[in-house]
């Protein structure tokens, strides 16, 4: 049985990211990049909506027990994602509005929270 705090496999994580990316593409967002890694944090998906840059954290749970994916985001993860996004924008000379979205995938059900944090 998977505990809510137990890490999920990379394979399941990729499946969740694929579902999230396809969902966001269907909503009209533009895909830029995925799995951007820095030593201090990772960005699951980088998307755009017009001129707005969107940094997406994807949380996946195969079962919705223990509060589900939507409750799996910690304050430490938020801090690391914000730092990674800031670094990404500096490296790519991006001077634009950005936001942070959360995609929660629970047992195949997708919940999108724009401006989640």
Curated annotation (Swiss-Prot):
Stored SUPFAM superfamilies: Restriction endonuclease-like (SSF52980)
Pfam families, A to Z: UPF0102 (PF02021)
Record InterPro entries: Restrct_endonuc-II-like (IPR011335), tRNA_endonuc-like_dom_sf (IPR011856), UPF0102_YraN-like (IPR003509)
An MF annotation (GO) of this entry: nucleic acid binding
List the HAMAP family hit by this protein, alphabetically: UPF0102
**PANTHER family in the record:** UPF0102 PROTEIN YRAN (PTHR34039:SF1)
Family note = Belongs to the UPF0102 family.
Q: What is this protein called?
A: UPF0102 protein Ssed_4252
Source species of the chain: Shewanella sediminis (strain HAW-EB3)
Record lineage: Bacteria, Pseudomonadati, Pseudomonadota, Gammaproteobacteria, Alteromonadales
